[in-house]
């Protein structure tokens, strides 16, 4: 957004509209390491079982092979508190009430130091992260990506929550357990519609089945500006080109679930393979059909292929 003044102006503009601003920050991934950042691998990086420094690979978007020289360094959970202390001292000067946590709800790893007093296992790491997220939640309204269980109590909004199964070949049916737990308690969304592997009607059906909100990653500049950069995964975000899709998805979800929001799931049934019925607390029932064949729900009611029907009560 440019300068500090531009960010503060954007925050005031959104506040006047009643829209929350959640600038995103990664605390566990070190995307930049200049002289002023003071990140030293031998002091601050987590260690694997072989004592080498751990990192996250960046994968080629077409081949999904790791890209040489594009590894992202990681921060040891033991160092998290001091980094957050430093961040808050600077961030609080902007007067922004929201904050988006990009990786604290997604990543969990150990730090296998030789010194047992400095070793951090995964259980300890989860406890450290939960403690720091709780501290952030006392000062800011939090949007959390991923939503691991130990950060759920502190989230106002969840994004990139798991709505779809991973597609394992031996799995023939899934149950939306995560949405059943969080629906009605916190506003949540899955992957952005325009960046998800599941697009179009399948994405829409999943929103109607789970009560999740539509979620998009949008930019005002053309997507080709991100080519050959660290942001090349934002390959379909140009708002003028996908505006029609954005409005279509929002309007359709609002037409079905708008009167039931927040959409609290109270029952979920698998009527047939890839045909599911969800009942919401309002009495609204939605039957979704992910298959390529119509599903005969009753003598006079058919759920179209890759479609849905909406029932209110017994009607």
Annotate the PLM regions.
Residues 1-21:
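Aromatic-lined substrate-binding rim segments of carbohydrate-active enzymes
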Residues 14, 20, 26, 312-313:
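Long, low-complexity, polar and repeat-rich extracellular regions
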Residues 27-315:
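Active-site-proximal substrate-binding groove within the catalytic cores of carbohydrate-active enzymes
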């Amino acid at each position: 957004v440019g300068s500090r003044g531009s960010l503060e102006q954007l925050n005031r503009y959104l506040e006047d509209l009643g829209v929350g601003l959640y600038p995103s920050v990664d605390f566990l991934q070190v995307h930049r390491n200049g002289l002023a950042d003071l990140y030293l691998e031998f002091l601050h990086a987590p260690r694997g079982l072989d004592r080498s420094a751990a990192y996250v690979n960046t994968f080629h978007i077409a081949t999904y092979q790791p890209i040489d020289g594009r590894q992202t360094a990681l921060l040891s959970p033991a160092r998290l508190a001091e980094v957050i202390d430093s961040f808050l001292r600077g961030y609080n000067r902007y007067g922004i009430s929201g904050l988006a946590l990009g990786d604290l709800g997604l990543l969990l790893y150990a730090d296998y130091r030789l010194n047992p007093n400095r070793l951090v296992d995964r259980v300890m790491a989860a406890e450290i992260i939960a403690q720091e997220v709780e501290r952030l939640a006392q000062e800011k309204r939090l949007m959390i990506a991923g939503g691991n269980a130990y950060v759920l109590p502190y989230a106002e909004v969840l994004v990139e929550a798991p709505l779809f199964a991973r597609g394992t070949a031996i799995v023939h049916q899934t149950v939306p357990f995560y949405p059943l737990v969080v629906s009605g308690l916190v506003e949540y969304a899955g992957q952005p519609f325009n960046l998800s592997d599941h697009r179009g009607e399948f994405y829409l059906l999943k929103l109607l089945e789970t009560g999740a909100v539509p979620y998009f990653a949008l930019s005002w500049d053309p997507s080709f500006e991100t080519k050959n950069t660290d942001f090349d995964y934002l390959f379909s975000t140009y708002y003028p080109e996908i505006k029609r899709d954005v409005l279509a998805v929002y309007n359709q979800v609002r037409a079905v679930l708008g009167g039931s929001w927040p959409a609290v799931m109270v029952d979920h049934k698998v009527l047939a393979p890839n045909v599911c019925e969800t009942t919401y607390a309002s009495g609204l029932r939605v039957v979704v059909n992910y298959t390529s064949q119509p599903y005969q729900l009753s003598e006079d009611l058919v759920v179209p292929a890759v479609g849905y029907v909406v029932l209110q009560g017994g009607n």
